[in-house]
Amino acid sequence: MSRYIITLKPIDKFFFGGDMTFSVGNNPNDNYNREYSSYLIESAYFPQQTSLLGMMRFLILRNNEECFDGVKITDTIKAAGLIGEGGFGEGRSYGKIKSLGHCFIKDCADNKDYHFAPYDSDYAVSAAEDTCLVNGRELTLHKMEGFSSKVWYKKYLECGSEKKEVSSFFVEDRRIGINRDIKTGKTEDAALFKQVSYRFSDSRYAFAFHAETDVDILPYDGQVVSVGADNSQFVIGIKNDHEDGNAGCSALKVTLLSPARLLSKDMDKVAFCMTEVMPFRYLRSTVHTKSYNVLDRELSRSERIEMYAPGSVFYFSSEADAEAFRNALNSYEDFRRIGFNEYK
């Protein structure tokens, strides 16, 4: 098994979809459009881990002539052995792809890696002497010097002691328009749309993540790949990676480096936290899928899951409680395998 550092340099603007899309098809009142569509769609800053998995699966597939002819899969058995039976899902294997790490930003000129900084990086957090009862449990109160509930906290990416606001890495690309019927030229119902995509603020930046595979992917370095449902295009860079990749952990504090799947029971040991949640869905497909139209039965959306956002911080009263929380994060193996639930 080989470990790689993979970079994605955007060719143009990029758009990473989230929970909502534009209206699909001609019926704005069908079930899909009622649940998922909006006239205002804004890209996420980072690609979803499932999008990186899909990109890697297709990269390996399209470079294998034994099971792919450039247009479609020709041998589903060989394809399943190469990239797995299907995309993300419980208990799934992804063939030659063994694991993916969380996505971060790399400064390719200075070889700096920027990861999400903890939400409390602007504040001095300490445990006060007072305690309180919450659901019958006695908890130590925490205080954050400098925090005001009237001023929303800033989000940063950090590289060592250096930190920059997340928004400083990106520049908005706004597109506003009206949809017209392609045959008649008449304005369609609910035709107004606004799409916010992004570009990097400096050409030196690229998305990056680590990957472990059982197939040599170095020959694919420099190819053009598509990421996300909007097919944003990137030039992929692939190099051997010999670093450990394991971030050190604080004894009584856990910071999320990636979105994380956690249930309410997993929060029982947390004494104090500063978090946000974000929606997560993914498309279900297999090597037998012929149509990738979201309205087709062959391609369906998963149920919505609430994930804890990267940068979320959790404090604990004892090392045992902190270790129990880390074990909970590690227990979601399907999510861990593709870069979710990573922490320091």
State each model region's role:
Residues M1-K344:
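Conserved active-site/ligand-binding neighborhood in enzyme cores
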